[in-house]
Amino acid sequence: MHLHLNHKDLLPEKRRLIENLRLREDVLANKTILVVDDDVRNLFALTTAFERHNIKAITAESGQEAINILGENLNVDMVLMDIMMPEMDGYETTQKIRREHKNSNLPIIAVTAKAMKGDREKCIEAGASDYITKPVKIDQLLSLMRVWLYK
């Protein structure tokens, strides 16, 4: 994981929004994030980083487990969805969440190693709110999360 953020990669309006957010109380504090990934190393890395920012993480190692958690827990503020998972991949899981979950505005960020042309669009078409590639840069992920949780 890389721990730096390149502001040049952001659109000017998102850059201004993030700079304003950093001046205020952190919108990530006390938020509940569902992290869906079949690789426990990724789950560990993200949950460890989230602890430092007072973010509560709930983990799921499969798409079906994520759907079950969302069915039981209406207090999830955001989902980070790995795309490449066995059985039910992130595309199918995202589509099911969009069809079945009570909060249709729930931000879902696709987290994937797929960085080829068209991969971002495929994630958005499946129902993801946004997209970030692996290896995840924690500061960049946190900034993206702030943008979606601030809305």
Predicted features along the sequence, with ranges:
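Conserved acidic segment of CheY-like receiver
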Residues: 30-40, 46-50, 79
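Receiver (REC) domain active-site loop signature in two-component systems and cognate sites
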Residues: 85
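C-terminal catalytic ATP-binding subdomain
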Residues: 1-24, 47-55, 64-67, 72-73, ...
